[in-house]
UniProtKB/Swiss-Prot annotation:
<keyword id="KW-0349">Heme</keyword>
<dbReference type="GO" id="GO:0004497">
    <property type="term" value="F:monooxygenase activity"/>
</dbReference>
<dbReference type="GO" id="GO:0005506">
    <property type="term" value="F:iron ion binding"/>
</dbReference>
<dbReference type="InterPro" id="IPR017972">
    <property type="entry name" value="Cyt_P450_CS"/>
</dbReference>
<dbReference type="Pfam" id="PF00067">
    <property type="entry name" value="p450"/>
</dbReference>
<keyword id="KW-0560">Oxidoreductase</keyword>
<keyword id="KW-1133">Transmembrane helix</keyword>
<feature type="binding site" description="axial binding residue">
    <location>
        <position position="441"/>
    </location>
    <ligand>
        <name>heme</name>
    </ligand>
</feature>
<dbReference type="GO" id="GO:0016705">
    <property type="term" value="F:oxidoreductase activity, acting on paired donors, with incorporation or reduction of molecular oxygen"/>
</dbReference>
<keyword id="KW-0472">Membrane</keyword>
<dbReference type="InterPro" id="IPR001128">
    <property type="entry name" value="Cyt_P450"/>
</dbReference>
<keyword id="KW-0503">Monooxygenase</keyword>
<comment type="pathway">
    <text>Secondary metabolite biosynthesis.</text>
</comment>
<dbReference type="InterPro" id="IPR050364">
    <property type="entry name" value="Cytochrome_P450_fung"/>
</dbReference>
<comment type="function">
    <text>Cytochrome P450 monooxygenase; part of the gene cluster that mediates the biosynthesis of echinulin family alkaloid. The pathway begins with the biosynthesis of the cyclic dipeptide cyclo-L-Trp-L-Ala (cyclo-TA) by the NRPS echPS via condensation of L-alanine and L-tryptophan. The prenyltransferase echPT1 then catalyzes the first prenylation step, a reverse prenylation reaction at C2, to yield preechinulin. Preechinulin is the substrate of the cytochrome P450 monooxygenase echP450 that catalyzes the formation of the double bond between C10 and C11 to produce neoechulin A.</text>
</comment>
<keyword id="KW-0408">Iron</keyword>
<comment type="similarity">
    <text>Belongs to the cytochrome P450 family.</text>
</comment>
Length: 534
């Protein structure tokens, strides 16, 4: 149960709490840091860095980089300087990758070199360094990833069908009576995770479990964003600032309070999952050999980190609704395929996937057309590497500009058009929404399976419309976004059952579905045991 809410408004207050005195110290640190950094760089750098726009002394390209939608500016620069480009952001060398070829050459073929993360002071302090998404590459990260993979292997995620079946049936039943699709998606995505991880279904959109966990994730996300802009950049560019006395760095105390709330929440959830009557992820990871030397708190973070990753599915489902409402002719083609393959007498099932190529294409094109993380998450090079005659130096921050990849006109002609047909014509088009290499999304297979069945059932069941498509599209083309993420703004859409027969079937299927997590997880466990026996 969520106990005590964190009392604060936004992470912006946290980063602004760096005092004027700390800023004075920062000036001295900047000059000293610059001196040693430049001396080290000139002595080691034998090859040139990749080309990029000229910056100013000390601050580099910081003033040229927009705070909102920087990926668009990066693409504009990459069109001029090439698919491997250097930016200097303060004292940080940042390498921007803007083509699938380059991203594959470096992030896939040399994955180990580029699987680390820049160590962000504020972000790590919020989790005590236990959040695997921010860990440096090494044994500790590999152990966390191993525990996560133990419940997210492709063959395992396919055995979670019983839970997806129940959750999507409830979703359809809810949308018969409300157009608040965002709340419905929020409940379903949270319930998928909470049931598997801790043995507790989320049955109502206003469940306090959702509000509490969402607040934690919001804080962490804002910390990550804040680390790359405004006052927060000082702490990241000059890490020595974190060692100043507490009266000069009040942000540290605030981070520590938030970290305590993370710790309590994750440990409480882990204990709930271990004590649940049915099989859960909590039980599975706790008994894994890799977990034996870990503390209870560290084990709890391996699952808690996955919750944040699961929340991206909410954004993706909202993108699906968006394109369904804005492009009714494409939605009609998807519905024609569903009617031909599935008919009206039953709901689409996971087993239908091989016969529904347009639905798969619909999902992939939606994610290409509106990437929810246009810059992905930053990586760090763990050693000097030569690539095409240029030096990618050790310690450089590496960003894959997913926006540039998805809007490459050579790869995706008419990139601003929503064209699922392109994926049907060429199923081998590069699809990189879930990242590259070892650091790609650990739950990609679970997410893809869940998104497919959710999309198929939504389009089978409903006609989805928006009252003002032109205004909605304009708003979404000019979003209020941050340094890395581009969340979908709120918009209205209506869900109308396609006919009375489908409406009756949805109501019947939900009425006879199991509602309690124990019965559902028993079915999941049977599937897993059956797979293991084979």
């Amino acid at each position: 149960m969520w106990d005590s809410p964190i009392i604060f408004t936004t992470m912006r207050e946290l980063v602004q709490s760096v005092s004027p005195a700390a800023l004075s110290w920062a000036v001295v640190a900047i000059y000293l840091g610059t001196f040693f950094w430049l001396r080290s760089r000139s002595s080691k750098q034998r090859l040139p860095l990749p080309p990029g726009p000229r910056g100013l002394p000390l601050i580099g390209n910081s003033l040229q980089t927009p705070a909102v939608n920087p990926w668009e500016k990066y693409k504009e620069w990459s069109d001029e300087y090439g698919p491997v480009m250097t930016l200097s952001l303060g004292l940080t060398t940042t390498i921007i990758l803007s083509s699938h070829q380059v991203a594959n050459d470096l992030m896939e073929k040399k994955s180990t070199i580029y699987s680390s993360r820049p160590q962000l002071v504020m972000f790590n302090r919020l989790s005590g360094g236990m959040n695997s998404s921010g860990m440096e590459y090494g044994k500790r990260w590999r152990d966390h990833r191993s525990l996560q993979a133990s419940v997210l292997r492709p063959w395992m995620t396919q055995r979670y069908t019983a839970l997806r079946d129940v959750e999507t049936k409830q979703l359809l039943a809810e949308l018969l009576n409300t157009d608040d699709f965002s709340s419905c998606f929020k409940r379903m995505v949270a319930s998928l995770f909470m049931t598997l991880a801790y043995g507790k279904r989320v049955q109502y959109p206003d469940d306090p479990e959702i509000r509490g966990m969402e607040e934690l994730v919001r804080v962490k996300s804002e910390a990550g964003e804040a680390s790359f802009r405004a006052t927060g950049q000082l702490v990241e560019y000059i890490p020595l600032l974190q060692y100043l006395p507490s009266f000069l760095t009040p942000w540290k105390e605030m981070c520590d309070r938030i970290c305590e709330q993370f710790n309590k929440t994750f440990v409480d959830r882990l204990r709930d999952g271990i004590n649940a009557p049915a099989w859960t992820w909590a039980k599975e990871v706790s008994k894994h050999k890799v977990a034996r030397p870990m503390s209870e708190l560290e084990i709890s973070y391996t699952l808690g980190t996955l919750y944040e990753a699961s929340l991206t599915s909410q954004q993706i489902l909202r993108i699906i609704v968006l394109v369904a409402a804005l492009y009714p002719e494409k939605t009609a083609k998807a519905q024609e395929e569903l009617d031909r393959v599935v008919g009206t007498g039953r709901l689409p099932a996971a087993a239908d996937a091989r016969n529904l190529p347009y639905i798969d294409a619909f999902v992939k094109e939606a994610l290409r057309w509106r990437p929810f993380a246009p810059l992905g998450a930053p990586r760090e090079s763990i050693r000097d590497v030569e690539y095409n005659g240029y030096l990618i130096p050790k310690g450089a921050t590496i960003l894959v500009n997913q926006w540039a990849l998805d809007y490459n006109e050579d790869m995706f002609p008419e990139p601003f058009s929503f064209l699922p047909e392109r994926w049907v014509a060429n199923p081998n088009l590069p699809f990189s929404t879930f990242g590259f290499g070892q650091r790609g999304c650990p739950g990609r297979y679970f997410a893809q399976d869940s998104l497919f069945i959710s999309t198929a059932r939504l389009l089978w069941a409903f006609n989805i419309r928006t009252a003002s498509p032109v205004e909605v599209e304009d708003m979404l083309r000019n979003p209020s976004a941050g340094a890395f993420l581009s969340p979908i703004p709120e918009f209205d859409a209506t869900f109308t059952a396609r006919d009375a027969q489908r409406k009756a079937l949805i109501e019947k299927e939900w009425e006879i579905s199991p509602k309690e997590s124990y019965a559902i997880l028993q079915e999941v466990e049977k599937e897993l045991i059956s797979e293991g026996a084979e």
